[in-house]
């Protein structure tokens, strides 16, 4: 049978688990297209801050 070396109290355990929370992604409205995108990321159309940075993929 396993024996723990040091017991963690309820408060220590819950304090540690307090940092395991889901974060809401930072979504911003793109002024040029009017679509919502994740901040500091290139949009699926290849735009970043209203400029064409990456060639847009061809639509089928």
UniProtKB/Swiss-Prot annotation:
Biological processes, Gene Ontology terms: translation
Keywords for the protein's UniProt record, in alphabetical order: Ribonucleoprotein, Ribosomal protein
Gene Ontology cellular component list: large ribosomal subunit
Name of encoding gene: rpmF
Cross-referenced HAMAP family: Ribosomal_bL32
Listed name of the protein: Large ribosomal subunit protein bL32
Pfam entry (one): Ribosomal_L32p
Keyword Manganese in record: no
Record-stated family: Belongs to the bacterial ribosomal protein bL32 family.
UniProt GO molecular function: structural constituent of ribosome
